[in-house]
């Protein structure tokens, strides 16, 4: 797209929102089946929406990922499905694999059509027998001459339809690989789509794909460089997980905006429920979850923009974002609206499966949490525990006993290295000091002082956790991989501590008192969960005061969020 970068970006983002707003206002967003209308997708293509992450050289906008993620939060307040499709298309679909791993020839061939929306894209990884366990993939591509012939079945593929372009993960000579595949406009014996009833993602196309000797040109194979096809897949998934967190922030803003009118209208025992502590607590806590998700989104997107792989950080954002959205939907939004939540046309009842589904797609939360933990301990295990195992193997010792002098002598080198680390850690931990951003030092505001306390708490907690992590590795040794419950639990606590640190640092740089108060409340609650304590009266006063401020319109950006009409209204006396 031509024009100055700033002008093009502003225009495309503004016009994309306008397209969605117009169709929402006219009631023309969905067709008779409840799917997004083709006209909507074309209109979005006309204004450059599908090229947000495509380089300008190929007709796209070339947004940074931070710009893209922040925009998704705004868009999700209008329509979360369209925001989700932007991620499917640009992150886990064909765009990111091509931009990152494609040759110049491949980019020139595919990206212009993806940028203008002539071809929309999807990501085909999951199979009937392979979800979290990607070693179970069965779809294969066999080369004959200048063509790969693909045979296999994919499942739960969002945004797939005839005539679209997919990133296909398959096995080539037993190794995972990624092919860019232009699906034909019509189904055939070689390619067909498999429909099924699906509660979630009801406004998008989500189907299975069955291939039988389906031809794909050899030149459509992406080169991962170091690694294999899963390297390509994870690169896109990292971005998709950040986008999920950004989407969750927008969806929760929509929930909060639609809690307020009902809380003002509904009266119990002569007073509007907006005056009740429980409702105020729900609104205050929801605001905290929103700020935490926005903090995680900015943090992880910034890391990706700086060139970091960010896999562990993106996992934290995905898990927290999806779990926060689930908690917000069930514990805060539904309970405030009561029975009306289940009426046709209610935001909760119509979308409850979409509110819950992010806990599963792009990696189920606890499975991802274990992957996070394994990545976290990998270097420590390699440095200290692997040498112990190698020494035992060399000496043929199967059941080590440190009371046996020969065993102790065989392990003297590796054990000494570990002992130095352990003693040094125990000695230095109480004396560690942490340097925090200048904003903390310069401000005397109570909000900043409390946020500094949260940041210091989480930093110290994470430092201390190194001993618990190492102790867990020492206790279970080679059986650690089978101790899934312990790994998931410890991983979850580490993730919460990171969320506290990121949220407190993010809010301290924010100049809005309500944002800082929301961050303070959610950090306080997450610290309580980490410590296993009970909520204090001070916390209840803090979160309900925040809820009162939100009910009076003081949460930034909420006035721009659509509010649905009340269902089954009545005359208040």
Residues covered by each model-derived region:
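Terminal amphipathic helices with adjacent charged low-complexity linkers/tails
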Residues: 265-281, 508-513
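A glycine-rich, basic-preceded beta-loop-alpha segment at the flavin cofactor/substrate interface
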Residues: 185-187, 209-240, 256-275, 298, ...
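C-terminal amphipathic alpha-helical interaction region
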Residues: 409-573
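A short core secondary-structure module
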Residues: 147, 151-191
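Alpha-helix capping/hinge segments and adjacent helical runs
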Residues: 48, 312-417, 513-573
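Amphipathic, small/basic residue-rich leader segments at the start of a protein or domain
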Residues: 1-89, 102-120, 132, 144, ...
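Loop-to-helix element that buttresses phosphate recognition and phosphoryl-transfer chemistry
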Residues: 260-261, 278-305, 497-506
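Flexible, small-/acidic-enriched active-site or ligand-binding loops
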Residues: 187-213
């Amino acid at each position: 797209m031509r024009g100055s970068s700033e002008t093009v970006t502003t225009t495309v983002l503004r016009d994309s929102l306008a397209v969605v707003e117009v169709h929402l206002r006219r009631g023309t967003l969905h067709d008779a089946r409840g799917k997004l209308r083709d006209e909507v997708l074309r209109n979005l293509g006309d204004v450059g929406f599908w090229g947000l992450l495509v380089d300008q050289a190929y007709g796209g906008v070339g947004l940074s990922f931070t710009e893209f993620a922040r925009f998704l939060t705004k868009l999700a307040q209008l329509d979360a499905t369209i925001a989700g499709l932007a991620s499917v298309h640009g992150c886990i679909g064909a765009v990111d694999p091509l931009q990152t791993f494609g040759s110049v020839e491949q980019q020139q061939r595919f990206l212009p059509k993806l940028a203008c929306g002539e071809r929309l894209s999807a990501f085909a990884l999951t199979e009937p027998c392979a979800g979290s366990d990607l070693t179970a993939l069965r779809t294969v591509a066999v080369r004959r001459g200048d063509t790969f012939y693909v045979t296999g079945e994919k499942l739960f593929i969002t945004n797939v339809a005839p005539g679209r372009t997919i990133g296909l993960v398959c096995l080539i000579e037993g190794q995972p690989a990624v092919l860019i595949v232009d699906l034909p406009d019509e189904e055939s014996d070689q390619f067909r789509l498999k429909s099924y009833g699906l509660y979630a993602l009801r406004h998008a196309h989500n189907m299975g794909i069955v291939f039988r000797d389906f031809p794909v040109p050899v030149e459509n194979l992406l080169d991962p460089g170091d690694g294999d096809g899963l390297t390509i897949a994870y690169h896109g998934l990292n971005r998709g997980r950040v986008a999920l967190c950004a989407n969750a922030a927008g969806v929760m803003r929509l929930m909060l905006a639609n809690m307020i009118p009902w809380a003002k209208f509904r009266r119990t025992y002569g007073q509007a429920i907006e005056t009740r502590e429980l409702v105020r607590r729900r609104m205050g806590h929801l605001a905290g979850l929103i700020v935490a998700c926005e903090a995680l989104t900015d943090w992880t997107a910034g890391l990706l923009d700086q060139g970091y792989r960010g896999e562990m950080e993106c996992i934290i954002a995905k898990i927290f974002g999806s779990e926060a959205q689930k908690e917000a939907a069930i514990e805060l939004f539904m309970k405030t609206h009561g029975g009306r939540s289940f009426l046709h046309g209610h935001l909760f009842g119509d979308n409850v499966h979409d509110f819950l589904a992010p806990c599963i797609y792009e990696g189920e939360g606890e499975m991802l949490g274990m992957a996070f933990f394994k990545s976290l301990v990998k270097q420590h295990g390699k440095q200290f525990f692997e040498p112990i195992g190698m020494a035992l193997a060399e000496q043929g010792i199967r059941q080590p006993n440190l009371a046996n002098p020969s065993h102790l002598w065989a392990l003297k080198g590796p054990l000494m290295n570990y002992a130095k680390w352990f003693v040094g850690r125990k000695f230095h931990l109480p004396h560690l000091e942490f340097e925090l951003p200048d904003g903390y030092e310069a401000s005397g505001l109570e909000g900043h002082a409390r946020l500094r306390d949260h940041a210091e708490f989480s930093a110290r907690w994470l430092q201390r956790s190194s001993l618990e992590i190492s102790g867990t590795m020492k206790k279970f040794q080679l059986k650690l991989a089978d101790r899934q419950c312990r790994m998931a639990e410890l991983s979850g606590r580490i993730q919460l501590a990171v969320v506290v640190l990121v949220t407190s640092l993010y809010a301290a740089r924010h100049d809005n008192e309500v944002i800082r108060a929301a961050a303070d409340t959610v950090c306080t609650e997450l610290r309580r969960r980490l410590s296993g304590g009970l909520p204090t009266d001070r916390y209840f006063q803090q979160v309900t005061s925040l809820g009162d401020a939100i009910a009076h319109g003081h949460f930034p950006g909420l006035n721009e969020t659509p509010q649905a009409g009340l269902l089954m209204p009545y005359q208040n006396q």
